[in-house]
Structures are given as C-alpha cells and as structure tokens.
Swiss-Prot record:
Keywords: Transposable element. It holds the Pfam family Phage_CP76. InterPro entries: Phage_186_CII-like. The lineage of its organism: Bacteria, Pseudomonadati, Pseudomonadota, Gammaproteobacteria, Enterobacterales. This is Protein ORFb in retron Ec67. It comes from Escherichia coli. GO terms for molecular function: DNA binding.
Length: 169
C-alpha cells in the first residue's frame, strides 16, 4: 500500500542533536528516570546506543517537544506529527496566525541566507514542521466547527456542490 523508503539524509540524527541542545538533559533524565549519561549517549548519533520507541514517547510527553518524532518521521519520508489532542475549534484564528508567522520566518531565513548554516537550517525545518502541524490543526478545527453546526455544514456542502457543477471548483 505505501512505499516507505529510508532517507539518505540523517534527519533523525539531526533531530536528536537539536533535541539535546534545546533541553536540560540533567533535569530531563531525572524526570524520565534515566541515567543522564545514557540519555546523552542515546541522543548522540556518533554513539552506538539508540533511543527505543517507548523512550521517544516518554521524552516527547515530558517535554511536549515533537522534534524526535518529527525527525523519525522525516527519516522515512513522512510529514511531521500532528497532536490531535490539541485541537480546539475556538483556536482556529490562533492556528492560522501562527502558521502565517512561521511562514514569515521561513521566508526571512531564505532571503537572508540563514539556511546555509546548520542552526539556520534547523530553524527553517522547525518552522516548516510547525506550519504543517498548525495547518492540519486548523483543518481539523474547521471541520469540528462545521460538524457542530449541521445547518452550516449543509450550506457549505450545497455551495460546494453548486460551484462544482458550474466548474468553479
């Protein structure tokens, strides 16, 4: 059904590096019940130790940072994760405005040439992942708004159907 291919680019390794730079590993290891040196080794791509799936889940849950999951998904050519548990139909304007701001950051980095550095590239990828996540959340919250009001959903379906019949869509 799907043809997953492992990327030649070290997306997960880069995600591990970015995650390690972003967090205080001493405090995080303590909260996770891990030895800090083992956590450092598992987040260091040059070490033979690797994070297990339950460890990735735990670290993501403790930090609310999806960098490791996004890197894992990018490694198999998938889009970043979307935390559906964050969906709230009243947050639709926030999702759209935040996505617009992230797109602005990507554009500014591209114009200024910041994407040539490792840190600039990490920032651009983080912003692009945020845009993908925020737009998916916006779509789900919009769908929730429409489902909450059946009359609105019927009107939207009618207009969409009419537009399609006239070749407008």
């Amino acid at each position: 059904m799907f043809d997953y291919q492992v990327s030649k680019h070290p997306h997960f390794d880069e995600a591990c590096r970015a995650f390690a730079l972003r967090h205080n590993l001493v405090q995080l290891a303590e909260r996770a019940g891990m030895n800090v040196q083992i956590l450092r080794n598992k987040l260091n791509p040059s070490q033979p130790h690797l994070l297990t799936a339950p460890e990735i889940w735990l670290l993501t849950d403790l930090t609310e940072d999806s960098t490791l999951v996004d890197g894992f998904l990018a490694q198999i050519h998938c889009l970043p994760c979307v935390p559906i548990n964050e969906v709230a139909k009243e947050k639709l304007p926030h999702y759209v405005m935040s996505a617009t701001a992230e797109i602005g950051r990507v554009a500014a980095g591209a114009v200024s040439g910041d994407v040539k550095t490792s840190a600039g590239r990490r920032d651009a990828i983080s912003s692009i992942n945020s845009v993908t996540r925020l737009m998916a959340l916006a779509a789900v919250s919009l769908q929730a708004r429409l489902q909450a009001n059946p009359a609105m959903a019927s009107a939207v379906d009618t207009v969409t159907g009419l537009g399609a019949s006239f070749g407008l869509l």
